[in-house]
Amino acid sequence: MLEKAPQKSVADFWFDPLCPWCWITSRWILEVAKVRDIEVNFHVMSLAILNENRDDLPEQYREGMARAWGPVRVAIAAEQAHGAKVLDPLYTAMGNRIHNQGNHELDEVITQSLADAGLPAELAKAATSDAYDNALRKSHHAGMDAVGEDVGTPTIHVNGVAFFGPVLSKIPRGEEAGKLWDASVTFASYPHFFELKRTRTEPPQFD
């Protein structure tokens, strides 16, 4: 009797380009794809949408959220026009500039990232337009509603099970990345697992 081949795991990953913790987790999931047979799908969420009805935000963070609309609007416009396959290279280009290179001039980041991803320059106009906001909200809620109201990003759906995290301060590489994925799949497969957490003691490191 032939044994059935193991079913490929699917990781649906919701990102906002501005979040440094999400950036690290996204680089981890791409490392996992090198050592495990998984399908990775990127989707757009929005920190600005997540926080738009909160009155307790510090003024500096509130200003940051006002700027956060631009990159996600461009990302969702690119997806709408060219398909979900463009999100990985576009996010990678944005994240490298924002986090690895420390470039926070978002207009410049958007323009250069579109070029890197081979996408039309005119998509940059979406950054200051609300034309794609309904699509952005739909994508955001598809990822975030399933995981709950009191979390942000990184949010991953592992084989359809949604959770916040893992939150990592460094990018696991090779088999180390694979082992962390194996543990994540194990947690996700148990329907009564909800949370495992400790206080962060170091900043994100992008190398």
Curated annotation (Swiss-Prot):
InterPro entries: Rv2466c-like, Thioredoxin-like_sf. Pfam families: Rv2466c-like (PF22234). Keywords: Cytoplasm, Oxidoreductase. It is found in: Cytoplasm. The keyword Transferase does not apply. One of its GO terms (cellular component) is peptidoglycan-based cell wall. It comes from the Bacteria. GO terms for molecular function: oxidoreductase activity. In vitro, the reduced form of Rv2466c catalyzes the reduction and activation of TP053, which is a thienopyrimidine derivative drug that can kill both replicating and non-replicating M.tuberculosis. Homodimer. This is Thioredoxin-like reductase Rv2466c. It comes from Mycobacterium tuberculosis (strain ATCC 25618 / H37Rv).
